[in-house]
């Protein structure tokens, strides 16, 4: 789990726009966040496997 102070800091509006960054909505992880879902790769995979993300399915070719 991400540090609570960093999550709170990320929620505040930054002084400059370029300082804003994405965090996972579930765990607060700052790296590897998919913009389409707002989730990190770990939470995205977990939710996709459980079938909680509509339209997402396991690849097979």
Curated annotation (Swiss-Prot):
Record key words, sorted: Metal-binding, Ribonucleoprotein, Ribosomal protein, RNA-binding, rRNA-binding, Zinc
Cofactor(s) needed: Zn(2+)
Amino-acid positions noted as binding Zn(2+) in the UniProt annotation, renumbered to this chain: 24, 27, 40, 43
Cross-referenced Gene3D superfamilies: 30s Ribosomal Protein S14, Chain N (4.10.830.10)
GO biological process: translation
Subunit structure and binding partners: Part of the 30S ribosomal subunit. Contacts proteins S3 and S10.
GO molecular function: rRNA binding; structural constituent of ribosome; zinc ion binding
Cofactor comment: Binds 1 zinc ion per subunit.
Organism: Nitratiruptor sp. (strain SB155-2)
Descriptive protein name: Small ribosomal subunit protein uS14
Described function: Binds 16S rRNA, required for the assembly of 30S particles and may also be responsible for determining the conformation of the 16S rRNA at the A site.
Gene Ontology CC terms: cytoplasm; small ribosomal subunit
Similarity comment: family membership: Belongs to the universal ribosomal protein uS14 family. Zinc-binding uS14 subfamily.
């Amino acid at each position: 789990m991400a540090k609570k102070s960093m999550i709170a800091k990320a929620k505040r509006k930054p002084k400059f726009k370029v300082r804003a960054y994405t965090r996972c909505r579930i765990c607060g992880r700052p790296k590897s966040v998919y913009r389409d879902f707002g989730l990190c790769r770990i939470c995205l995979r977990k939710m996709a496997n459980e079938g909680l993300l509509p339209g997402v399915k396991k690849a097979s070719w």
